[in-house]
UniProtKB/Swiss-Prot annotation:
Membrane topology value: Single-pass membrane protein
Protein name per the record: Dimethylaniline monooxygenase [N-oxide-forming] 2
Signal peptide residue numbers: none
Residues noted as binding FAD in the record, renumbered to the chain: 9-13, 32, 40-41, 61-62
Keyword NADP: yes
Positions bound to NADP(+): 60-61, 195-198
Amino acid sequence: MAKKVAVIGAGVSGLISLKCCVDEGLEPTCFERTEDIGGVWRFKENVEDGRASIYQSVVTNTSKEMSCFSDFPMPEDFPNFLHNSKLLEYFRIFAKKFDLLKYIQFQTTVLSVRKCPDFSSSGQWKVVTQSNGKEQNAVFDAVMVCSGHHILPHIPLKSFPGIERFKGQYFHSRQYKHPDGFEGKRILVIGMGNSGSDIAVELSKNAAQVFISTRHGTWVMSRISEDGYPWDAVFHTRFRSMLRNVLPRTAVKWMIEQQMNRWFNHENYGLEPQNKYIMKEPVLNDDVPSRLLCGAIKVKSTVKELTETSAIFEDGTVEENIDVIIFATGYSFSFPFLEDSLVKVENNMVSLYKYIFPAHLDKSTLACIGLIQPLGSIFPTAELQARWVTRVFKGLCSLPSERTMMMDIIKRNEKRIDLFGESQSQTLQTNYVDYLDELALEIGAKPDFCSLLFKDPKLAVRLYFGPCNSYQYRLVGPGQWEGARNAILTQKQRILKPLKTRALKDSSNFSVSFLLKILGLLAVVVAFFCQLQWS
């Protein structure tokens, strides 16, 4: 059984991994290369090598009730979508509540993680770190890699002939912090993911003109969904997930297309994906269509060539006098402290069992946490990964044979390509609810709906038709939390609480309003029949 566990990184995945280690009675030590927790969500004015970077205005794309850890709801007065500083505040509250800071060695860089000579029998690792210029060695029974995958910028300059002639400024979106200094400029943003769209919208408020280039187009969703509820609280239900799994693919694609076009017609805005039958991750942005309507942003096709001052696009159009090019072209990822044979990265892909475990190790004592991109919140996903991993380390859960794991990796990759395509940005993509259930099943934390229908039908209905959030995985099994049921039944109140900033009359007036509507309808019917009688 693993006892001493090295956790690399004190971002979201690192913090929840620490807690899961403590919950299972393991002895974690976390190595964080910077001076504080939070990882990518801790904004800093300057870009730092080896550290994820965000712009000052970043707001979460997943809502608080769908993003909180399973036994620690966010404060009810927190907004539904959080500015990065507010999310960091939650992580600080979380770390303090569970006393996690004492396990973290700050300003400590992991230089290497190597198998011990007797690894085949012990499963142990030699971890070399550096702090204040001094190297230290330590042996650990297991390692959790939580270093993230938004550190190494991907800038495919060879795909942009003429970039060497371009006289303006160009840089990766990782270096963008705020709109200051870009006033009155003509700006080209290459790439229309979440970051590219956010940056284009923000710059368009004061720039002379913003262009955004997209190779394949994209669906754009608002954070606001039916009846004003957060999109993910509506989209991610077990019922809807079941429909997407059992209906024919063509029907599912048609439904998704109709849903995406309900807000605005993507074809009219030049955004409709070329292959709209691939379930590409949509962009979450509330302002893109508005800025397009205002002409502040213009959608362009793929850049064919760049000159000293202009951009030539594949459709033959040319935009002159470009001052700035921002490459919002995503990230590559690597693990420089690991031997290539441990977690091999090829074409921005890794072969890991359930996106977590290398399949070829004699002992399953190395795991990657958070190296995934679900169509939902990463926080509950990383938590379930860590809960399973720590139980594997402890010997309470076991993995199948190497052959079985490799077959799963191959089939999972084929399914991913079939659903999401082969783009580099989609290599870590997976279905949200299905993946959470898969992990929960491994540790015995998936709720039994048939049983609940008889024992607690009210809760069963909420689980199936309501938001599929992390509390569901604390109802049963190891780590069961007595507050889980109440958290599920009261989540609507926490969603609405931060919106109740203006005193209104009691909501019971709704019933009076409804009654008046019924009476009005009856009056219309009576008037109609009276008219027939007199005619």
